[in-house]
């Protein structure tokens, strides 16, 4: 077996990890072209096994790479201690200043490539898009509330009749004035029954009259809110496409929004794939988990996976068990997505079977256990001798206080 250590300018190997005292003791060498060194270093960082296979074919023997998880090789220790000396002998450096400059350049180029590859990862884009949608939702809620309060000065009854912010903004954009809220116009946008109620409310509205230019400002504000709703739909469609490409198993089990939020909370698909099911189950419930660890309160049964329909639509005593089953399947789905396998249909079938089993097994809530009150500690009865001693001590203290003399200023003799 060949024990191999990499340096920025080449790969070096010896058989059976033998001692190395000089360049002549190194049996296998593969020197790199200076222009290709940053690319080779990046490849070594991201695909070390591929490079090991290439060396195996070239050198014709089994390869063992020195990594952070292995014990240091003898050849590795020699090269690290003599990096400049060996490089100079091989013709890479003429002096120490040149060595420092080249090492700095190679390290900088490697860092740039790592950052570039990190930014190109699709799961990082998924996280940003999901966060953008979340920010838009908060903004839309805030602006819609402002629109409702503002337009209620003119048509207050509409606020109670239309619950959805998007529909409310759409009505103001298309109709504007109260006189335009006729049944025929409203039926183009809303169901007939609701259209009739709004038309009747518009006729008998208690709202005040506004000037045309005041009303135009409100209508333009509503138009901007509508544009934001359209942008949100575009982002959601884009997120759905990304999730189906990068995490089809998670998307099938958890849905687009919940799956993207899980990837975001984990910090990426790779990190989510490395998480155990117990951690995935409580993602998003960190505060409750820390409260359990610090103060001993009940641990959380679920985090953001509570938003899954299987958990939300179940009775409270079944939710913890269903959350555990869902988290187990999501952990498998994340690993399958990371390696590029599609097993979502099989996972979904097993999950549904497990949920049905839980619902059959626990149809009724468990009986509540009565909490036993902690017994108060009985005060130990003090003996008569101890009581008499305390009384004597108190009497002595009182006598001592009376006997004490107060020392003040003495009067001067005349």
Swiss-Prot record:
Gene Ontology cellular component annotations, sorted alphabetically: box C/D methylation guide snoRNP complex
Feature: compositional bias, Basic residues: 361-414
Residue numbers spanned by region Disordered: 358-414
InterPro entries: Helix_hairpin_bin_sf, MJ0694-like_N, Nop56/Nop58, Nop5_N_sf, Nop_C, Nop_dom, Nop_dom_sf, NOSIC
Domain Nop: 246-360
PANTHER family (alphabetical): NUCLEOLAR PROTEIN 5 NUCLEOLAR PROTEIN NOP5 NOP58, NUCLEOLAR PROTEIN 56
Protein name as catalogued: Uncharacterized NOP5 family protein MJ0694
Organism of origin: Methanocaldococcus jannaschii (strain ATCC 43067 / DSM 2661 / JAL-1 / JCM 10045 / NBRC 100440)
């Amino acid at each position: 077996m060949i024990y191999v250590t990499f340096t920025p300018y080449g790969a070096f190997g010896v058989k059976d990890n033998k001692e190395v005292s000089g360049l002549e003791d190194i049996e296998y060498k593969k020197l790199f072209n200076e222009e290709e060194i940053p690319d080779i270093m990046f490849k070594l960082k991201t695909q070390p096994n591929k490079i090991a296979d290439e060396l195996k074919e070239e050198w014709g023997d089994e390869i063992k790479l020195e990594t952070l998880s292995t014990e240091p090789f003898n050849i590795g220790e020699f090269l690290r201690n003599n990096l400049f000396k060996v490089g100079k002998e091989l013709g890479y450096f003429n002096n120490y200043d040149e060595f420092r400059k080249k090492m700095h350049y190679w390290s900088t180029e490697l860092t740039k490539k790592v950052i570039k590859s990190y930014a190109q990862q699709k799961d990082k884009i998924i996280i940003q898009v999901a966060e953008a949608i979340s920010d838009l939702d908060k903004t839309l809620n805030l602006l819609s509330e402002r629109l409702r309060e503002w337009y209620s000065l003119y048509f207050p009854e509409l606020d109670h009749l239309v619950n959805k912010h998007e529909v409310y903004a759409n009505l103001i954009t298309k109709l504007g004035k109260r006189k335009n809220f006729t049944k025929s116009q409203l039926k183009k946008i809303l169901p007939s029954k609701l259209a009739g109620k709004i038309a009747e409310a518009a006729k008998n509205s208690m709202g005040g009259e506004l000037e045309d230019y005041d009303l135009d400002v409100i209508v333009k504000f509503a138009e901007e809110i509508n544009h934001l709703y359209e942008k949100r739909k575009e982002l959601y469609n884009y997120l759905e496409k990304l999730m189906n490409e990068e995490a089809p198993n998670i998307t099938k089990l958890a849905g687009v929004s919940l799956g993207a939020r899980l990837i975001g909370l984990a910090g990426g698909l790779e990190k989510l794939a490395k998480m155990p099911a117990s951690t995935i189950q409580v993602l998003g419930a960190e505060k409750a988990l820390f409260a359990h660890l610090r103060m001993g309160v009940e641990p959380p049964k679920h985090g953001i996976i509570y938003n899954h329909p299987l958990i939300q639509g179940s009775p409270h005593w079944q939710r913890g068990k269903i959350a555990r089953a869902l988290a187990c399947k999501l952990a498998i789905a994340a690993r399958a997505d990371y390696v590029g396998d599609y097993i979502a249909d099989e996972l979904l079938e097993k999950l549904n079977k497990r949920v049905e089993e839980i619902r059959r097994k626990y149809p009724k809530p468990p009986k509540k256990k009565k909490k036993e009150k902690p017994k108060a500690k009985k005060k130990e009865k003090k003996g008569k001798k101890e009581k008499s001693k305390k009384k004597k001590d108190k009497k002595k203290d009182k006598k001592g206080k009376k006997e004490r003399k107060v020392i003040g200023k003495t009067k001067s003799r005349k």
